[in-house]
Amino acid sequence: MAKKFTQHRGIVLPLDAANVDTDAIIPKQFLQMVTRTGFGRNLFYDWRYLDAEGQLANPDFVLNKPEFSGASIMLTRENFGCGSSREHAPWALTDYGIQAIIGSGFADIFANNAFNNQLLLVTLSEQQVDELFQQVAAQPGIGFTVDLESQQVQAGDNIYPFAIDPFRRHCLLNGLDAIGLTLQHDADISAWERQQPSFLR
């Protein structure tokens, strides 16, 4: 069973960029692995490091700034996750420790891949996202609370309601991935199989 997401509070990582594509999230040279772990170190590799070997950190990139160490909520702009479909993108984000991303829009294929990997995407208006960026700029290292049960983001004294597909909300709240959903009907599946002719079993 996947991990349940009900409510999460964490340090906010402000990635103030629009149209961040999946090749920026996890470059193609790291796509050979097929397990979900080990991708976090290579998240935003080309922006995060100044050398090809990944030994020299870029001090100006947000992931390398000490005030955002341990961040688990990302704040970004519109059309995050555009470009080619690669499930490695949410793998890299979750392996790094990101549990929720707040933005003003997400690419459809990325959104599907994120959901399949229990990564919550919260869509707010551009004005609301601007307000959140202003809060983080005024107080680097600030924490927000993302509450999936009440469908709202708490940022300081401000509350931002958000909408989410009811089915996806149900799955995230209950820790249900594709396998978990199937196992909910295990008894029905077994009963159907027993009814089939022996030559079909």
From Swiss-Prot:
Q: Name one GO cellular component term.
A: 3-isopropylmalate dehydratase complex
The pathway to which it is assigned is: Amino-acid biosynthesis; L-leucine biosynthesis; L-leucine from 3-methyl-2-oxobutanoate: step 2/4
UniProt-listed Enzyme Commission number(s): 4.2.1.33
Q: Does the keyword Lyase apply?
A: yes
A GO MF annotation of the entry reads: 3-isopropylmalate dehydratase activity
Q: Give the domain of life.
A: Bacteria
**Could you give a single Gene Ontology term from the biological process aspect?**
L-leucine biosynthetic process
Q: Which Pfam families match?
A: Aconitase_C (PF00694)
Instruction: Alphabetically list the UniProt keywords.
Output: Amino-acid biosynthesis, Branched-chain amino acid biosynthesis, Leucine biosynthesis, Lyase
Record bears the keyword Lyase: yes
- Quote the catalytic activity from the record: (2R,3S)-3-isopropylmalate = (2S)-2-isopropylmalate
Q: How would you summarize the oligomeric state and partners of this protein? A: Heterodimer of LeuC and LeuD.
Functionally, this protein is described as follows: Catalyzes the isomerization between 2-isopropylmalate and 3-isopropylmalate, via the formation of 2-isopropylmaleate.
Family recorded in the similarity comment: Belongs to the LeuD family. LeuD type 1 subfamily.
> What NCBIfam families does the database record attribute to this sequence?
leuD, PRK01641.1
**PANTHER family attached to this UniProt entry:** 3-ISOPROPYLMALATE DEHYDRATASE SMALL SUBUNIT (PTHR43345:SF5), 3-ISOPROPYLMALATE DEHYDRATASE SMALL SUBUNIT 2-RELATED-RELATED (PTHR43345)
Would you tell me the protein name for this molecule? Answer: 3-isopropylmalate dehydratase small subunit
Q: Which organism is it from?
A: Erwinia tasmaniensis (strain DSM 17950 / CFBP 7177 / CIP 109463 / NCPPB 4357 / Et1/99)
Its encoding gene is what? leuD
